[in-house]
Regions:
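N-terminal targeting leaders of membrane proteins
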Residues: 27-121, 210-255, 647-649
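N-terminal cap/lid segment of alpha/beta-hydrolase-fold proteins
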Residues: 256-304
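Short, surface-exposed "cap/lid" segments of acyl-processing enzymes
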Residues: 300-347
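Alpha/beta-hydrolase active-site loop
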Residues: 358-383
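Alpha/beta-hydrolase-fold enzymes
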Residues: 409-529
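Short beta-strand/loop motif that positions the catalytic acidic residue
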Residues: 584-587
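Conserved alpha/beta-hydrolase "acid-adjacent" motif
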Residues: 592-598
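Catalytic histidine-centered segment of alpha/beta-hydrolase-like enzymes
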Residues: 617-629
């Protein structure tokens, strides 16, 4: 989190705290779980299927680590954030890039020693060449010259990695005050890193380095914390996996293998083009009746009257995630105002927008979304009177499915409710059951590997994913993942979504399903129990019992389950969707969340001017491409013009 230049005194004080935290560990609850092997109720076949074990990171001193994480978050919020705001305002982007490059160049001795200690002499030579080139041609390291011109990429190694190569493979995860996430092994390695960092011995230079690095990193940190229900848990998993894979020198992506599953991962390339676009937004809150918290929404408003796009992200999509902001940026650049809320499975919406503790039933989820959008629309009109023309509801993935449901069930006679002139769905699933069973199957794709090969292949896949996210691949080239690797990554992401949803549902009421005791400072044990639940198991263990309790037309059996799932299939609303001039659908023929029957239904039952199906792209994996964006924009602009010219009935 903060400097890698750590004082020995601070580290010793942390060691004392570590000893205290070890005592706290004795208070942790063991993981307990229901034995589903003999269960013969609704959905029994799903509970008794073989499952891949979720990647587990032991955390024996979790109470201590969480306490330090909260302390560090306070520092980031109350000290670093104001500094970042000033720095971002007064420093041009080109200068920020130069400072970042210069600081990275100054870490050359650390990388050099880290490579030497591991016997990586060719890497050490490459690092030396990089340093000489960037320090001379690159004006003291302010301009990155070595990689784009000479092909010399950074060889990032450190003393902690050297310890790992020497045999210290696994180490206790540790959060240090001021320094953030590390392990005992890597924490000791920080002392060696500091010793070979020349800036450590120049107090003012070290201070500038530390302040600059954490200030530059703040926006990424803030979005990560805000977008995740439990950023500590995800941060721990990513940090430890990254360190393990770096030590093991797991392979990075190369050239591509084409598949719909791998193309889906292209969503990582959907990023804002202007890093300052987010700064032009405004964020407000509305109070949804019966919600526990206020619901935030973010908007970008044109100076003149313009169409207003209500943007719904995917399942647990965050309103400020890169993909959401990128779509908003494209729409804003074409003259529309944009407003967005977080997805219905996101922790923000679960706390501030939903009326029931178990999301997953399309009609109720969509109704909650519509209620929230109605409040948002009224609040925007109050703040920006006369600035909005047409209202367009645009949903991505699950947000697109909710968009289509609202299109099919709209009631234009209702007073004081937002009226949409156009409903646009991008990569919306058609059949919820097909989509979630596909995601469950994806998560278990490593079962096809031999048991002794499975751990290595899973970690190799995770290394590829981490490198892709860090921008180590070309956005114009498909990612090099086999279909099974891509499937596992997609399934893994959605398994964490269900974990967070179940945990939050259990906070509101005890469904009698989970057995592990939850503590204020320990979540590892209950998470391990929850992670045993697939999407379909969540449906049968939580959603079905809940609706069987509150609705007389739903019974706790397979008939009741099929009744709920039928209402989550868009074919049930075909009469109001097919041929509706206010409804548009954009998708990809090789989207795994669409069955062949779904694609055929869209192609044959919908009007030709309603549907655009691209040949490739997987699930949202081609939205970063200019040609795809151009087609969507052209069809949208034509549809808006048609709606404007068509007199109301």
């Amino acid at each position: 989190m903060l400097p890698r230049a750590v004082s020995f005194g601070l580290f010793c004080r942390c060691a004392v705290l570590l000893a205290v935290a070890t005592l706290l560990n004795s208070c942790q609850s063991p993981t307990r779980a229901v034995d589903w092997s003999q269960y013969d109720g609704p959905g029994a076949r799903y509970f008794q299927q073989d499952e891949v074990s979720f990647p587990h990171v032991p955390d024996p001193i979790e109470p201590f680590n969480r306490a330090v994480s909260i302390f560090n978050h306070g520092l980031m919020t109350w000290i670093v954030r104001p500094i970042h705001s000033v720095y971002w305002f007064v420093t041009p982007t080109i200068l920020q890039t130069g400072i970042s490059n210069g600081l990275d160049n100054a870490r050359f001795p650390q990388r050099l020693v880290g490579n030497f200690l591991q016997g990586k002499l060719s890497n050490a030579a490459s690092e030396t060449g990089r340093f000489l080139i960037n320090s001379t041609v690159g004006l003291g390291g302010l301009i990155e010259v070595a990689e784009p011109i000479f092909g010399l990429s950074p060889q990032r190694e450190d003393v902690g990695q050297a310890f790992g190569r020497w045999g210290w493979q696994h180490s206790t995860y540790l959060q240090l005050p001021l320094l953030g996430p590390t392990t005992v092994r890597d924490g000791i390695g920080l002392i060696g890193d500091a010793a070979v960092n020349p800036l450590t011995y120049v107090t003012w230079a070290s201070t500038i380095q530390n302040a600059s690095e954490v200030t530059i990193a703040y926006p990424t940190y803030a979005r990560f914390v805000e977008s995740n229900f439990d950023p500590y848990e995800l941060g721990r998993l990513l940090f430890v996996l990254d360190r393990e894979l770096s030590i093991a020198d797991a392979p990075s992506p190369g050239l591509a293998q084409a598949s719909g599953q791998a193309e889906t991962l292209g969503i990582v390339y959907l990023e804002p083009e202007d890093p300052r676009f987010l700064d032009r937004s405004d964020t407000y809150e509305v109070q949804v009746p019966v919600a526990r918290e206020r619901l935030p929404y973010t908007c970008w408003i044109q100076d003149e009257a313009a169409p207003l796009i209500f943007l719904l992200p995917g399942t647990s999509g965050y309103r400020l995630a890169d993909s959401t902001v990128a779509v908003a940026e494209r729409a804003f650049g074409r003259g529309a105002s944009v407003v967005t809320i977080s997805g219905s499975f996101n922790h923000e919406f679960l706390a501030g927008g939903t009326t029931n503790p178990v999301p997953g039933f399309l009609p109720d989820d969509a109704a909650d979304v519509y209620s929230a959008l109605n409040l948002v629309a009224a609040d925007l009109e109050r703040r920006y009177p006369g600035r909005f023309e047409e209202n367009i509801l645009l949903g991505l993935s699950l947000g697109g499915m909710q968009t289509l449901y609202l299109a099919a069930t709209e009631n234009p006679t209702l007073p004081e409710h937002v009226k949409f002139d156009l409903f646009v769905a991008i990569n919306a699933p058609v059949d919820t059951k097909h989509a979630i069973t596909t995601l469950d199957r994806f998560y278990n794709s490593p079962l096809e590997y031999e048991p002794h090969q499975r751990p290595y292949k899973i970690r190799r896949t995770l290394r590829k994913a981490l490198d892709a996210v860090r921008g180590m691949t070309d956005a114009h080239a498909p990612l090099n993942f086999s279909p099974s690797e891509a499937e596992f990554l997609i399934g893994l992401a959605f398994r964490t979504i269900i974990r967070d949803v179940i945990y939050q549902a259990q906070e509101q009421r005890d469904f009698g399903v989970l057995k592990t005791v939850r503590g204020n400072w320990t979540r590892t044990a209950p998470y391990r129990e929850i992670l045993q639940f697939s999407f379909m198991e969540y449906f049968y263990a939580f959603v079905l019992p809940y609706y069987a309790e509150i609705r007389p037309d739903v019974t706790f059996d397979e008939t009741g389950a099929e009744h709920l799932l039928a209402a989550c299939d868009l074919r049930a609303y075909a009469a109001k969707l097919c041929g509706n001039p206010k409804v548009l659908y954009f998708g990809n023929k090789n989207d795994s969340l669409l069955s062949p029957a779904d694609v055929a239904w869209l192609q044959t039952e919908w009007s030709a001017d309603q549907v655009v199906l691209f040949e490739r792209g997987g699930h949202m994996g081609n939205l970063h491409r200019d040609d795809v964006q151009g087609v969507i924009a052209a069809v949208l602009e034509h549809a808006i013009a048609q709606q404007t010219e068509t007199p109301p009935k």
